[in-house]
Amino acid sequence: MTVPATTKDPRDSLLDSPLVHFPSLPRDSYLPHPTEHTVVSIDDEEILPSTRSSLHDVLQVAWSLVLADQTSSPEVVFGMAYDGRTTDDGEQAIMPFRLRLRAEDSVQEALAAAAAVTLQMRQWEHMGLRRFSTMSPQNVVLCQFRNLFVIDHKDPTEDCVERSCTSYSKGYALTVLCEIVDQVIHVHAMFDPLVLPPGQLRLILHQFGDILKTCLRGPPGRVKDLQQIGPDGLNYIYEWNRGGERDEGIVCVHQLIEDRFKQAPFAAAVCAWDGALTYGELDRWAKRIAAQLVEAGVKPGSFVGIYMQKSVLAVVAMVAIVKAGAAFIFLPPFLPTVRLQLMCQRTPVELVLSVATLLRSASDLSVPVQVLDYRAKDEEETAATSGGSEIAQPNHPLYAIFTSGSTGEPKGVVVDRASFGPGVREYCRRAQLGPNSRLFQSVSYAFIVSIFEQLISLALGACICVPSEEQLQNDMEGAMCRYQATWGCMTPSVARTLKPERLSCLKTLALTGEPVNQSDMEQWKDHVNLYTLYGQSETGSTLLINSITGSLADSRGLGRPSTGACWIVDPEDPTTLRPLGAEGELLIETTALARGYMNNLEESARTFIEMPKWLKQLRPQGHRSRCLLTGDIVRYYDTDGTIRLLSRKGTGAKIRGQRVELGEIEHHLRPKFPDARHILVDVVCPAKAGTGHSILVAFVHGPWKDTEKTGELATATSEFRQQARRVIAELRQVLPSFMVPSAIVPLADVPTTATGKVHRKSLRERMSALTVAEILAYNQEDRSAYRAPTTEQEALLLSICAELLYLPASSISLDNSFFQVGGDSLNARQLAAKVRSHGFSLLATDIFEASTLASLASRMRQYNQTDSEVSTAPEGDPFEGLKQELLGELPSSLVKENVEDVYPASDMQARAIRTHMLDYFPFEIKGQLDRHQLQHACETLIRRTPVMRSVFINFRGKMLQVTLRSVAIPYKELTIPTGEDPLSWARLHIAEDKKKTAAFDRPTIRFTLCRQSLQHHIFIVRLPHAIYDGSCLEQVAKQISAAYNAQTLPEAPDFAAYARRCARLRTPSAMDFWRNFLAESEVTRLPHASKGDEVAVIYPGECSPRSPPPGITMATAIKAAWAWVLHKRTGKLDVLFGQVGSTRGIDIPGATDIIGLCLNITAVRVQFAGLQTVEDLLRMLQQQHMRALMYETADWTDIVANASSWPEGTELDSVVLHENFGGLPALDLGDAIGEMADPIFSLSTSNPLTLVTWPSTQTLTSFLLTRENVFQKEYAEGLVTEFNQTLVQFLDFPESSLCSISTCG
């Protein structure tokens, strides 16, 4: 259902934006099992409104807001039920409830919108969910909600709520039942814990209760006020942050280090590749250098650079600078000179400490250089060695570090001495880092972690183990063992290169900088104490450390801060706290924060913000805490205050509206590529793909042999492509479709940042330069290289293929088939028609049979239109005799002079008439409309299009189509009552019109203009399905638009010419083909529960299959999957069913533009004996389709009567219909535009079962259409599930044997 609006209003149109269903399922085929139940109660006699309806609106808006926060989408959909309200069949009424919430709307507007949806829902709920879904394919999608919201007013004496909640919950991952008893609301939830963790659900229910109480106590002004945290949520957060107000006072790390010099002078301080020092030795050497620095003019507030590789001397230099009262900045030699120069200028650096071997490059920094000598270690102390640390103040800088800036230039962060010290002892206690620890210092000096670990180790008396760069690159494990390292900190990417069983000395490992996945935990959990570490350059000594005990949930938590408190605020408004469970930006409150950014007051003010008002009210006056906006998006995940990191602000990984855990995908990929050095997954926006179009891409860095490379990318070999396709197929079995990468790309090298992290942005940018086709080509079968056309036919064919497939002609090889370059059966028909329009003949069968485009071009011959033109002269008209017979016995409803043409209705037309198929297409028109001109356009359409003037007559047991010379133009105007939503009112008008029985012996086409204002109309076109199909809707819209704008379109072929051509194709050879095709066969029939009622029902499903193998169309794959389902369900090795196919491939010029019903049902037969693999089945069906193309216009009744041994009237039991035409057309009406809203269809149930499928960008929607009570509900749902699973398996593993295919339908 939709909120009152128009298609231009973002609240409207069932499919104007992708629905984000909540909760997301572990995989597409997962069936929820709601086994857990929980309840919370809201008890406040003063807040409940006096009327039920107003309370219902509040409940619905509150639940919508919760879902909006969970999905990060303003538009939500859920199932809605009022306990005890029933359908016409006496079942509990459940309907979809779709609502778009806008933060700036008033709450009253939101409540009114919910009330309007409820009113609209009341008008349809009598139908029930299944019948409602049959109104249009869009409704099928809408009805696939995953959570159900129930409102129930209970008598206080009743006590059956849990049973009631259980009865509702079947099939839904989450059911929330609001039981209202007197002045108490009991909120019950039944849920599947494998889909929705209990902790997350508890937060959801608390948030729901908070919103509800806030709204009921007196609705605040705007919706955004309801999206803030409520009183109960505040109490939780205050409790979690209890202790955050504690102030340790002035604690400076340099003082802690000085204490260690005095307390343990003989303890090991540094053990490096180039030497070792005790704390006493380190103290003495650093003092001498500090004295030299003071002599050179260094003072508190000065910055001194350290231009050295990892070494014992670098540690000494760092301590010496601190002792001199100055601040240090590491200048790693591997960074570009230009960047280092910029860092020196921005800081500014007064002096650089280096070594003799680096003197030449150090001189390029344009800063005075002082060379340190290892021999100075043993020199006698001279005089003043106390340095300047005694006069340095807490507000003097301790160090500076540069991070990546959003502008592309490095951003300098300055940390004061007072900002590094608070929380150090607490951090070490939690991280098990103490005087006996030996810390392996592997992290680059460009990474803030290197500063954290060195300063904290020295402050606690640990030993810093410093390997050489060569040891880190070539033998990291050996170095850790030689130094007997017990404590390490590194990124997960680095840790994955190590073997824990070889590191018996290592006791503690902290992972930082990147997400930790399940594989990381499994790798290390039995060998070390495993932690995650969170900190930023701006956080000083405020670090968050989290102990991982073995579950994935543990690894995603950030832990608690070593000092201060964590809050989650609105990313757009940091003065607002986010509700429990909602996403927001992490704000850290602490006394240990950086001073700010160098020479960037504006950026500092945005990041280091004043304490928000709500926080000031919690803290005593004069409290020293400051606040940092981290830029990280997080959320609470349980009622214990666990915070989970989701993404960086503005760069969250989302696909199809769903947040994607990239680490989880990487975890599943890692066992598939056991020799890979790195496995990465990221979201890529391909070139020329349009705004917002993104795909998932996996990157595998492995020991590829014999491959070329382009930058970081390696060339995909045939073996790699085959492996990648197999891996993607396997991932589909364990992950939801939106988490399966579209492509796997081999890497020759992994780009890294200056800090040693994987440079994901570099990879994204590299891939974003490629088109979708170029990215997908990494996993496709080999395509031939481009070969320029040499003939007129080849050039024309390439040009038409490029136009149809939206590909550059240079990317299409003449040595590939039409299907290898992206064509399908519909494109094939369009290709044949376009080739004919250019003066060449080409049959659709040629396209299917030709192995290459070159061979297809060779089949093109000059086309002589006169050879194929169908004459309508009496002597050549196969229907002239029929016309004369009808005129001799003309029904009273017709006038002889008004009869223009007569010919038999096709089987499809007759079915549409028998089942009263009338469809409605509402166009919402915005802008200045000339109503008279629109009426004239409708008259022109009728006049120019004979099929629009057709009626249908039963004559001597046959259905005839009679074209009239003139008809009264069925056009009328209505006025929409004031205050009514235009589209809602129009849909109700359509619903009333559908109740009337149409007489098809009179024109049934209707045009209705519903006027709300001069600028706003709804234009309804009613079409009997007997005179149109989906492929010609665009042509109908073009004809109306052209006539309105006084333009002339080329004459389109008349449907009568099509009918006559079909009649001429009914040849003896056609009947012979079908006779041989059906020999010794029988229609495959599924077990029916009953003949069923006339009411149509739909059982929906969805899957995400891969593209079929080259030369196979998706329609063929769908038929193969359905054939397999029939085989498995019936046990028959010879199955027969029907398919609905377009017959626009007929050899009439311009057949694609015919307005009329150009569809037919033909038979599909599969004999499984002799078929070994899935690909055997696919190839057999594709070849069968090609052979039948010449005879596809034969009517089923004709085939049964003249080409089978079956009784007259034998019908197919099941029929497959694969819809594959474009989007909804629009009307161009001068200054106004008419956009088609969701059509309302009448669905045919002439066959017991029709399987309907239609593709979208990344999914295939399917549904079974049948009559009510033909099948048991569980059986029908099992059929569609089994079909979807079979199709995915067939296309994931086309080379697999058929006997290995298993489904759980």
Swiss-Prot record:
Higher taxonomy: Eukaryota, Fungi, Dikarya, Ascomycota, Pezizomycotina
Domain notes: NRP synthetases are composed of discrete domains (adenylation (A), thiolation (T) or peptidyl carrier protein (PCP) and condensation (C) domains) which when grouped together are referred to as a single module. Each module is responsible for the recognition (via the A domain) and incorporation of a single amino acid into the growing peptide product. Thus, an NRP synthetase is generally composed of one or more modules and can terminate in a thioesterase domain (TE) that releases the newly synthesized peptide from the enzyme.
Domain Carrier: 788-864
Record-listed E.C. numbers: 6.3.2.-
Biological process per Gene Ontology, one example term: amino acid activation for nonribosomal peptide biosynthetic process
Alphabetical list of InterPro entries matching this protein: ACP-like_sf (IPR036736), AMP-bd_C_sf (IPR045851), AMP-dep_synth/lig_dom (IPR000873), ANL_N_sf (IPR042099), CAT-like_dom_sf (IPR023213), Condensatn (IPR001242), PKS_PP-bd (IPR020806), PP-bd_ACP (IPR009081)
GO terms under cellular component: cytoplasm
Cross-referenced PROSITE patterns: CARRIER (PS50075)
Reactions catalysed according to its record: hancockiamide D + (E)-cinnamate + ATP = hancockiamide A + AMP + diphosphate; hancockiamide H + (E)-cinnamate + ATP = hancockiamide G + AMP + diphosphate
Organism of derivation: Aspergillus hancockii
GO MF annotation terms: ligase activity; phosphopantetheine binding
SUPFAM superfamilies according to UniProt: Acetyl-CoA synthetase-like (SSF56801), ACP-like (SSF47336), CoA-dependent acyltransferases (SSF52777)
Domain of life according to the entry: Eukaryota
Keyword field: Ligase, Phosphopantetheine, Phosphoprotein
Segments of this protein annotated with the region Adenylation: 278-672
Name of the protein in question: Nonribosomal peptide synthetase hkm11
Pathway(s) of this molecule: Secondary metabolite biosynthesis
Region (Condensation): 926-1166
Functional description taken from the UniProt entry: Nonribosomal peptide synthetase; part of the gene cluster that mediates the biosynthesis of hancockiamides, an unusual new family of N-cinnamoylated piperazines. The NRPS hkm10 and the NmrA-like reductase hkm9 are proposed to convert two molecules of L-Phe to the intermediary piperazine called xenocockiamide A. Xenocockiamide A is then converted to hancockiamide D via a series of hydroxylations and O-methylations.
SMART domains per record: PKS_PP
Biotechnology: Hancockiamide D displays potent cytotoxic activity against murine myeloma NS-1 cells, suggesting a potential antitumour application. More interestingly, hancockiamide C, the likely end metabolite of the hkm pathway, shows potent Arabidopsis thaliana seed anti-germination activity, but is inactive against the monocot Eragrostis tef seed, suggesting that it could be a herbicidal lead targeting monocots. The herbicidal activity of hancockiamide C could be due to its phenylpropanoid-like structural features, which may act on the plant lignan pathways, and hence warrants further investigations.
Matching CDD domains: A_NRPS_SidN3_like (cd05918)
Family, per entry: Belongs to the NRP synthetase family.
